[in-house]
């Protein structure tokens, strides 16, 4: 049956997304300019933030790049922000974009080694509780020295590998796309696959939270940590020690949550690795070991050496540049010289890189319209004793709906400005820096918006395979969110001041001399 031009345009608009979703996006595009010009730019700015969060929440209905991008283009077009401000935000976050483009692609060329190591881990640790703890601890440790996005990229790569191996076997070795379950013809296989999905979901969430537990501890764990450390004049050791009064209790309780949710099967956790899947992975491992040639063994050794280089080099150059060196070294010594083979490595990260660039446009609107200014002013007007908790809570709240790099940067700049103008003392500024860092890193696990690693997981090729939606991520993160936020708040409120004083008296902390530029330690 023929359709009209209007119907054809509507069908093409956002493709196979539900009609109600298409109407919602069109509604946003109509309402936003009206509110901006006739009601209030401030209200329109907050509406844009909420609408962008909505597109992220509906990531499984439609990839957020298209609807979010349309909203961002309109925001620039009507004057909510300027192309210059967007370009400035992109320039400020160039490290993160380079990380996504090159580091994630670099990890792709180390997949053989990662699959080899994690298959051994998965098959040798039969207790799901201990395995979950191992994933959480490994992610926390790696995130203290690597960027959380890199760690998540590793775990995603491994999980896709596991899923592909089992899916190919259970769908009768079909060469079809692994997103297509039509080759699985009996009920038992479907149930096993669903259980395997639940198993992978729980491991991914434990690993994701692990990146937050480890990432908050060191100045290289998250991009905003570097900004905060630079502003306060702390080196690697200073930063680690100053954070300990808050981060150590949170780390311990975070691991406790990991054990409890697995043991009592709470919040979607507790799914075991199905025995059928274990058999398939064991057979795959045995066959792979038997077939492995000397050439392939040398590839694994080369990839292991490159892995060591990856960890050591992160302190020598920008993360993205290290990622580029990983691509060059891995492809050179593993014999990958075909352009088509190289291109596959970039497929996973580039859509998310584009989405993150759109996100920076939304951040530019937040800056241009001063959406966070009333909250910041309210916090700075509070008494010094209340400031720490308020900074922590408002940082956490705003980081859950915005980019934690942006929130951390805005707050540390405001705190630094308050110190330079004599509103807060040096000691108070340093305590505020701890509250800001922990506030941006801990409560932000509540939603994928707050943590770039969570957002990357949500929009990755793995999420639809294991049925990991925005809502499910929020639900599964809830026990961690509550415990980490509350323990962090108690640490800021009751432990931070006395422990910092004790560490200073014990000689573990030296007071920096802060100039008008950058803080410089004695």
UniProtKB/Swiss-Prot annotation:
UniProt signal peptide: none
Annotated transmembrane regions: 13-33, 98-118, 140-160, 239-259, 304-324, 356-376, 390-410, 446-466, 477-497
Recorded topology in the membrane: Multi-pass membrane protein
The organism's place on the tree of life at top rank: Bacteria
Catalyzed reactions: 2 Na(+)(in) + 3 H(+)(out) = 2 Na(+)(out) + 3 H(+)(in)
Main location per the UniProt record: membrane
Sorted UniProt keywords: Antiport, Cell inner membrane, Cell membrane, Ion transport, Membrane, Sodium, Sodium transport, Transmembrane, Transmembrane helix, Transport
One Gene Ontology term, aspect cellular component: plasma membrane
GO MF: sodium:proton antiporter activity
Location(s), subcellular: Cell inner membrane
InterPro entries: Na+/H+_antiporter_NhaB
Function: Na(+)/H(+) antiporter that extrudes sodium in exchange for external protons.
Name this protein carries in UniProt: Na(+)/H(+) antiporter NhaB
Annotated source species: Yersinia pestis bv. Antiqua (strain Angola)
